[in-house]
Amino acid sequence: MTKKRLLVIAQELDPYTEDTYMANLIAKLPQFAQDKGGFELRVLMPKYGTINERRHRLHEVVRLSGMNIIIDDDDYPLVIKVASMPNSRMQVYFLENEDYFKRKFMFADENGKGFDDNHERMIFFSKAVLETVKKFGWAPDIIHCHGWLTSLVPLFVKEAYNHEPIFNHSTIIYSVYDENVLGALPENFAQKASINGMNQALLDPFIDGDQLNEKKGAFYYADAVIKGNETYSDAVTERIENLDKPVLEYQDKDTYLPQYIEFYKKLMGATEEE
């Protein structure tokens, strides 16, 4: 029987980024999904400037590198590197661009102020991930997005890459975490994010008054949602409760791995029945 394919898109991953709850949670998922769930895996994340290439033995994948990612008529070179996770044969692909990711901090400066171009970084990373998967020639059954940086992936798969056969049968899961990074709505957001000739009106679910609300938009376009944290703001909690799609409740560190695999398989079963 052909193995099902799981694409994990991570904004953080232990041991490559800071030791956070999200980074630790995601780190255990790929190996478990492969060994216990029987999945074939690909793991993609940004190549932040904070990642030590020598320590983690990153090397460039020449056959995948050399693409330019076009955002609002501007070209951004994409370099793809790979490394094996410690004590594992599991490979992680790192998406590198000097303009957006070669910095001393991940999401905010030394004073804790979020980078002004975080919304552009989200656009770039989301498009770069999908272009990389196309280059793989590898059609994912499940696309599991973790964190705000991946929030545009569900929209892009559904609307900007809807004519790409490689994504025709993908089920998209968005894991939402209790994080607030983006804030005020940049005036050029819809223009920049409407990639591949997409209608700007498709970005409306991401707009919440004068705020850029990546959770609201990701909830709208994802096929299913996983609660990565136990608690959220009242507004986020209410949005999750009102979703008319599958939601996996928060799972603690002892239960989340088998529960995620079961959730994947339920979603794939529902898709195959349609």
Annotated model-derived regions:
Residues M1-E274:
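Catalytic cores of nucleotide-sugar-dependent glycosyltransferases that transfer UDP/GDP/TDP-activated
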